[in-house]
Amino acid sequence: MVNAILSKKKKLVADGVFYAELNEFFTRELAEQGYAGVEVRKTPSKLEVIVKASNTQGVLGEQGRRIHELTSLIVKRFKLSPEGIAIYAERVEERGLSAAVQAEALKAKLLSGLPIRRAAYGVLRFAMGAGAKGVEVVISGKLRAARAKSQKYADGFMIHSGQPTRDFIDIAIRHVLMRQGVLGIKVKIMKDPAANRFGPRALPDAVKIAEAKDEDEVIPAPTVKSYKQTAEDETETDAPVEAEAEVEATA
């Protein structure tokens, strides 16, 4: 039993190390193609690696040459059989809600010489326009002076703790080598809980208040007293009719 538990732990650690190295490899190789993450699926026949990027054509390359090069490098690094692994490219549908894509876009803007404030606000506007609930961009390093500091740009609503941070917030960290030194980029995007496809669709403290119904006239419940009153009213209304009938008969 102990050996079985240890083997499970070793397998989990090995899978985690494999995923971390694979993610680091694709982050380094596919930075220009808008790399946004990787998904590993194990099937009985082969290992499927799904690469998510904004530019899938750049991942595939001309006549599939680039993806074959990536496959050969992974096979050589992890000592896998060429027939036992398959790499697929998947396009990121919502680029504005992917923190990795926006971090790479911000990195490209900084390398092109765009001012830091203008580049950061461009990311904020693009993400909020795509339907994000909140966006936060932090850039740290030697921004203007010789002393390093950090600047934070935020828009919308953002949470910082608890399980909802795992459910609704996407985080990406990148580093860019500038002339004055290395700058750190951190992008946090909070997705709209109502548009969440998988998992909860609302925050834990969200309260839904039902709309008030129209106030109709309330009819009181009948009682014994009301029945008696109704009977007396009926006898009073019937008495004059009987008297008129007797007068007509005598005439």
UniProtKB/Swiss-Prot annotation:
GO terms for biological process: cytoplasmic translation; maintenance of translational fidelity; nonfunctional rRNA decay; ribosomal small subunit export from nucleus. Belongs to the universal ribosomal protein uS3 family. GO terms for molecular function: DNA-(apurinic or apyrimidinic site) endonuclease activity; RNA binding; structural constituent of ribosome. GO terms for cellular component: cytosolic small ribosomal subunit; fungal biofilm matrix; hyphal cell wall; nucleus; preribosome, small subunit precursor. Transmembrane segments: none annotated. Gene3D superfamilies: 3.30.300.20, Ribosomal protein S3, C-terminal domain. Component of the small ribosomal subunit. Mature ribosomes consist of a small (40S) and a large (60S) subunit. The 40S subunit contains about 32 different proteins and 1 molecule of RNA (18S). The 60S subunit contains 45 different proteins and 3 molecules of RNA (25S, 5.8S and 5S). CDD domains: KH-II_40S_S3 (cd02413). Keywords: Cytoplasm, Ribonucleoprotein, Ribosomal protein, RNA-binding. Residues 232-251 have a biased composition (Acidic residues). This is Small ribosomal subunit protein uS3. The keyword Ribonucleoprotein applies. Residues 223-251 are annotated as: Disordered. It is found in: Cytoplasm. The keyword Ribonucleoprotein applies. Residues 22-93 form the KH type-2 domain. NCBIfam families: PRK04191.1, uS3_euk_arch. Component of the ribosome, a large ribonucleoprotein complex responsible for the synthesis of proteins in the cell. The small ribosomal subunit (SSU) binds messenger RNAs (mRNAs) and translates the encoded message by selecting cognate aminoacyl-transfer RNA (tRNA) molecules. The large subunit (LSU) contains the ribosomal catalytic site termed the peptidyl transferase center (PTC), which catalyzes the formation of peptide bonds, thereby polymerizing the amino acids delivered by tRNAs into a polypeptide chain. InterPro entries: KH_dom-like_a/b, KH_dom_type_2, KH_sf_prok-type, Ribosomal_S3_C_sf, Ribosomal_uS3_C, Ribosomal_uS3_euk/arc. The lineage of its organism: Eukaryota, Fungi, Dikarya, Ascomycota, Saccharomycotina.
